[in-house]
């Protein structure tokens, strides 16, 4: 996944930030690190509720950005989000062949397995609405602009505007939807009540345009079925490959092929360019479904852990709180531990003992109350009687253990299942109240979990700790670790003094020897001590 954000608080333009297995956010205070880290939870809380605006700026359970006006960079009126992700050939084939809408139209092209499978979606948000969408899929470049009532002002594919009539999108957003579908106003499919397929009218109207285009090369015996047979044989990829494959395919229909060759060269090029664009129109709402489903699946597995986590209390009342996700401050950790099965509890304690210096965490019930217990070296202590460090690290450890042991719950919105199993853990300042040795132990656990192919976990760490950075470098250098330089991305945030102090981001990598390339010298060093003599001399 690559992410780009523009005009969100201090983030004027992040550039394309690669989310590596381990991504570390570094920089001084108030330069946009937390804004970037929390933007993932912002998308999560937006996607999983029916709402009247694309982005839900406040949620009591996740993050609070206030409002759009509080969030947009001063002097600007829109915020931009961009996400790029890759799908496997198998996933794209499933999309093409088993998409219900495309099956209905008998247009389920195979997709060129050698073509770039990356999909990029960009969208700009003004107050209460999306104003612009740009999608890059295969060799299609979709650009959609809206007015303030979600009427489509322009719909352009590969620089070719659509000519279908009045287009619009709904102004409300349903569960799992961030990119709205395009609808065709006053179309019979919409008025007949079969519009529940979502955007079917737009696809059908685009198909009619394809039939009209074929009138230039068809004979009297060519009908809709013939056109469908031709297009089902054409492989989709980049435009040049499509053009060659189309010409190769229509050789099986002698009259059509002869009429096609009878066109002038520029007319043939115009024909195939228009055809490629119209197939893109047919695909558009299905591509939107694909994007919404992928992003819903990705953000559903975001776990955010805040910098200030719940401190241990002496007693907890047994409650019926949510146990699916660990809350951002870890308030529900005692109840999650309480509800573990005996076999799970045994495994949990063995895991923490093995990975964290012989430490075990458990809960003890006394009537209707619970106590968090820490056991080490034969001693059992109420967690409230230990230092802050253990209570701060507990939610992180519990998340890591759950990822290694518990089955994945998929969010499935639509017609198509992916094999995605990816999860994203975001932690702000995991080093709080932790001795450097425990910080190193934590990083060791992170490296083990991100290299487990069955889990597909990525971790974003916002930190001020040189211990964490140095430990990652040791893992890159060490022959005992599976971590290499491509697995770690350090994102350095700094003030751009030439741009009103807004954030400027740089991505820094380790080399194969664990040395940082382009590291800002003295970043972790304090400035020189200033003289206080002047202050002392002014004291009466």
Q: How should these model regions be labeled?
A:
Residues 17-20, 96-101, 316-328, 506-508, ...:
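Short, polar loop/linker segments at the starts of domains and inter-domain junctions
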Residues 233, 278, 339, 433, ...:
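Charge-dense, low-complexity intrinsically disordered segments
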Residues 1-298, 357, 361, 476-483, ...:
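P-loop NTPase switch/coupling surface
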Residues 243-393, 398-420:
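Extended helical coiled-coil dimerization/tether regions that scaffold
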Residues 1-92, 342-525, 531-539:
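Switch/communication elements of ASCE P-loop NTPase nucleotide-binding domains
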């Amino acid at each position: 996944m690559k992410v780009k954000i523009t005009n969100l608080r201090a983030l004027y333009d992040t550039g394309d930030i690669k989310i590596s297995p381990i991504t570390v956010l570094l920089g001084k205070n108030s330069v946009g690190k937390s804004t970037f880290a929390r933007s993932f939870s912002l998308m999560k809380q937006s996607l999983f509720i029916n709402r009247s605006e694309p982005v839900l700026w406040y949620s009591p359970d996740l993050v609070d950005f206030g409002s759009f006006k509080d969030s947009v960079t001063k002097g600007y009126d829109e915020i931009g989000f961009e996400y790029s992700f890759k799908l496997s050939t198998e996933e794209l084939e499933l999309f093409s062949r088993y998409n219900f809408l495309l099956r209905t139209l008998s247009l389920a092209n195979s997709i060129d397995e050698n073509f770039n499978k990356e999909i990029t979606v960009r969208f700009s948000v003004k107050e209460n609405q999306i104003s612009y969408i740009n999608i890059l899929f295969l060799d299609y470049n979709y650009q959609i602009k809206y007015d303030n009532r979600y009427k489509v002002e322009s719909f352009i594919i590969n620089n070719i505007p659509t000519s279908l009539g009045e287009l619009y999108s709904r102004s409300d957003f349903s569960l799992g939807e961030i990119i709205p579908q395009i609808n065709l106003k006053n179309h019979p499919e919409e008025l007949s009540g079969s519009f529940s397929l979502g955007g079917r009218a737009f696809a059908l109207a685009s198909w009619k345009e394809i039939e009209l285009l074929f009138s230039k090369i068809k004979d009297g015996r060519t009908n809709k079925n013939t056109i469908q047979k031709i297009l089902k044989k054409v492989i989709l990829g980049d435009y040049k490959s499509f053009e060659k494959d189309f010409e190769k395919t229509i050789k099986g229909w002698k009259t059509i092929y002869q009429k096609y060759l009878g066109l002038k060269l520029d007319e043939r090029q115009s024909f195939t360019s228009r055809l490629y664009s119209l197939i893109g129109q047919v695909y558009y709402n299905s591509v939107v479904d694909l994007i919404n489903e992928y992003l819903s699946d990705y953000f559903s597995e975001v776990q955010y852990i805040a910098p200030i986590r719940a401190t241990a209390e002496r007693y907890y009342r047994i409650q019926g709180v949510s146990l699916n996700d660990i809350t951002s401050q870890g308030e529900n950790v005692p109840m999650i531990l309480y509800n573990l099965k005996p076999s799970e509890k045994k495994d949990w304690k063995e895991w923490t003992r093995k990975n964290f210096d012989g430490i075990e965490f458990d809960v003890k019930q006394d009537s209707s109350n619970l106590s968090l217990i820490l056991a080490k070296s034969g001693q059992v202590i109420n967690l409230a009687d230990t230092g802050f460090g253990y209570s701060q690290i507990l939610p992180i450890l519990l998340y890591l253990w759950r990822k290694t042991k518990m089955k994945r719950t998929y969010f499935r919105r639509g017609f198509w299942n992916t094999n995605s199993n990816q999860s994203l853990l975001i932690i702000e300042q995991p080093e709080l109240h932790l001795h450097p040795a425990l910080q190193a132990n934590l990083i060791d656990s992170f490296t083990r979990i991100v290299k487990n192919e069955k889990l597909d976990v990525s971790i974003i760490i916002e930190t001020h700790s040189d211990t964490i950075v140095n430990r990652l470098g040791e893992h890159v250098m060490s022959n005992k670790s599976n971590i290499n330089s491509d697995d770690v991305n350090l994102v350095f945030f700094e003030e751009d003094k030439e741009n009103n102090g807004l954030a400027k981001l740089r991505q820094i990598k380790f080399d194969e020897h664990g040395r940082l390339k382009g590291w800002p010298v003295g970043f972790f060093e304090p400035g020189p001590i200033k003289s206080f003599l002047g202050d002392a001399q002014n004291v009466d």
